[in-house]
Amino acid sequence: MAEIKNYYFSSESVTEGHPDKICDAVSDAVLDECLKQDPNSRVACETLAKTGMIMIAGEITTKAKLDYQKIARDTVRRIGYTSSDMGFDADTCAVMESIAEQSPDIDMGVSAGKGLFNSESSNVSEGAGDQGIMFGYAINETETFMPLTIHLAHRLAERLTKVRKDKVVDYLRPDGKSQVTVEYKDGKAARIEAVVISTQHAAGVDHKQIEADIKKYVINEICPANMLDSNTKYYINPTGSFVVGGPMGDCGLTGRKIIVDSYGGHGAHGGGAFSGKDPTKVDRSACYMARYVAKNIVASGIADRALVQFAYAIGVPEPLSVYVNTFGTAKVHDEVLANIVSKELDLTPAGIIKRLDLRRPIYEKTTAYGHFGRELPEFTWEKTDIKDLFANAK
């Protein structure tokens, strides 16, 4: 079947004040505090947020001493929920916890030398923390090798937060969402068909004022002018009002924005969430590694886009499979690239952790505006330092 060349594609993002993102941030703040005190911490931390309360639960084995109340309140305060007028208050919300240690059966499979498959004399290594399939994706339509739709959606959500925190638009509240539809012609991004922004705001603000401010200070600052035209549609708070937001408007849960966190519907997703998980959990670390590999393949110039898949079994260090698909854009066969990945890179959890330096307290920064496509110093998986592995592949 021939590939469709003319189509519309949409991606969404959310702000750090979205209830699910509050939970991601709290879970990763707990993880960061564990890793700060004990880099070998095992963490699986879930958070729920609803009106007036936060619940932290999970399995954590660590030498760290944790003040869950402080971690949760500091995180919510940083996001900006500091008054009951907003529907949530960092200083008055209840913080509950239910934490156990990691299951000894899981520990046996993960800890080097304990399990059936990670204790052979030739391969004493940490086993994968779970089974699963993990994907990474990259495309050369933006400077960060991310799909344009999710890139724009993230930047709009990020800008929405910035104008709120900088008080450029002083009636905005923390909760918000963005969505971008791009028209593709002959397989290339041609124009922006639609922009959706939903932003929480103070009561009594005229809807026309919100529309004007969001267009001026958010959309026009982010969306390329040459991709906006007279037919571009704008949907700004399309219900007419968004006063009730955050956990009062919707219950929040860790791990419920996996497509926002990855590629906005492009590529593929194995189903595992990221936040609250230490790097022995391949749901997180192997996805970061897959992005690293895909980005370096595309950055090398040997392909225009790349999808990389790894698969793991719990307790087994080596991946069960390595897959590369460049959608016919590569200068060599995809199996050549897959063989390079398999032979030249250590894809065990220990190898990934070492290469990407993942036992650091870096994770709360990942929770909003994309785990991928932001070239922050801590985001080692965004480096293109192995592109030469692929540049001259034959």
From Swiss-Prot:
Residues reported to bind ATP: H18, D175, G176, K177, D250, R256, K257, A273, K277
Binding site for Mg(2+): D20
Top-rank taxon: Bacteria
Subcellular localization: Cytoplasm
Cofactor comment text: Binds 2 divalent ions per subunit. Binds 1 potassium ion per subunit.
CC cofactor: Mg(2+); K(+)
This protein's record includes keyword Signal: no
Ranges where the record places region Flexible loop: 102-112
Entry's EC annotation: 2.5.1.6
Pathway recorded for this protein: Amino-acid biosynthesis; S-adenosyl-L-methionine biosynthesis; S-adenosyl-L-methionine from L-methionine: step 1/1
Chain sites annotated for binding K(+): E46
Alphabetized Pfam families for the sequence: S-AdoMet_synt_C (PF02773), S-AdoMet_synt_M (PF02772), S-AdoMet_synt_N (PF00438)
Catalytic activity, as annotated: L-methionine + ATP + H2O = S-adenosyl-L-methionine + phosphate + diphosphate
Binding residues for L-methionine: E59, Q102, D250, K281
Family indicated by similarity: Belongs to the AdoMet synthase family.
UniProt-recorded name of the protein: S-adenosylmethionine synthase
